[in-house]
From Swiss-Prot:
Residues noted as binding Mg(2+) in the record, renumbered to the chain: T67
GO molecular function: ATP binding; ATP hydrolysis activity; four-way junction DNA binding; four-way junction helicase activity
Coiled coil ranges: none
Annotated stretches, region: Large ATPase domain (RuvB-L): 1-182
High-level lineage: Bacteria, Bacillati, Bacillota, Bacilli, Bacillales
Pfam family, one: AAA_lid_4
EC numbers for this chain: 3.6.4.-
Protein name, entry field: Holliday junction branch migration complex subunit RuvB
NCBIfam families reported in the protein's UniProt record: PRK00080.1, ruvB
Chain positions covered by the region annotation Small ATPAse domain (RuvB-S): 183-253
Stretch list, region Head domain (RuvB-H): 256-333
Record function comment: The RuvA-RuvB-RuvC complex processes Holliday junction (HJ) DNA during genetic recombination and DNA repair, while the RuvA-RuvB complex plays an important role in the rescue of blocked DNA replication forks via replication fork reversal (RFR). RuvA specifically binds to HJ cruciform DNA, conferring on it an open structure. The RuvB hexamer acts as an ATP-dependent pump, pulling dsDNA into and through the RuvAB complex. RuvB forms 2 homohexamers on either side of HJ DNA bound by 1 or 2 RuvA tetramers; 4 subunits per hexamer contact DNA at a time.
Recorded domain comment: Has 3 domains, the large (RuvB-L) and small ATPase (RuvB-S) domains and the C-terminal head (RuvB-H) domain. The head domain binds DNA, while the ATPase domains jointly bind ATP, ADP or are empty depending on the state of the subunit in the translocation cycle. During a single DNA translocation step the structure of each domain remains the same, but their relative positions change.
Amino acid sequence: MDERLLSGESAYEDADLEYSLRPQTLRQYIGQDKAKHNLEVFIEAAKMREETLDHVLLYGPPGLGKTTLANIIANEMGVNIRTTSGPAIERPGDLAAVLTALQPGDVLFIDEIHRLHRSIEEVLYPAMEDFCLDIVIGKGPTARSVRLDLPPFTLVGATTRAGALSAPLRDRFGVLSRLEYYTVDQLSAIVERTAEVFEVEIDSLAALEIARRARGTPRIANRLLRRVRDFAQVRGDGTIAMEITQMALELLQVDKLGLDHIDHKFLLGIIEKFRGGPVGLETVSATIGEESHTIEDVYEPYLLQIGFLQRTPRGRIVTPLAYQHFGMEMPKI
């Protein structure tokens, strides 16, 4: 996949910044009001009963704050968090090592939990339900199963593809929270807060302009702010004003709706080669040279959100709004 400024996926350079900007409490966390309010109630109730919080599944597009919320849950509960990911747990023994290292009440955060192998999931079921671990010692006829007790813990799973989780795993989560795209006002507040951390002056209109082009995603808003700051320091006086912001975003090929050259390639490919659709996912994948799951998980969610694309039983269709955005007329049937 092309290097993409507007990807919601975490990049290497995002890690340190996101850690330094990460709010520590639900009160500090901007946006996701519904999920935040519910978690506040569930956490307070668990603390009042002196119990661990029910297992939590956070799902939604990348870059919306799932990792941040997992850390906040641990902070609010006053416990430690251990972090891993679905791809990192390759064998049942890997999971057993993580589970047996937990202390009572700890939060275990598994990112990309939909990528756990089914054999790993089966080890996880009794751990989630009964706080125990069944392991097999030996091989062949002499093999025997041993059950180990685990301390009570809270599993927080994060995924961009909730539908890819097996039903037995999904059903074992007591709390399911979908994270939604952020509003422009919420993103503008995040941009201004990040600018304070950077100790750089930003115009409120410039913050709004960055927010409008950030695809409803805080990670993208902060990434755009970093790049605009570069232009402000090199081509301006260091202040992030509206004029330098617009110039920087145009040079970065981020249009007024937050679409970049890859979005243009995707939409125009369907328009020019397939008369706007309908066209099958695999055909689009072959045409633009991207894997189908990348198209589904990375490209399409925002295009669906802004009404530029429709998924139908017959395939993908580019909408009149997209034609209008490109200044093109829809083909006559």
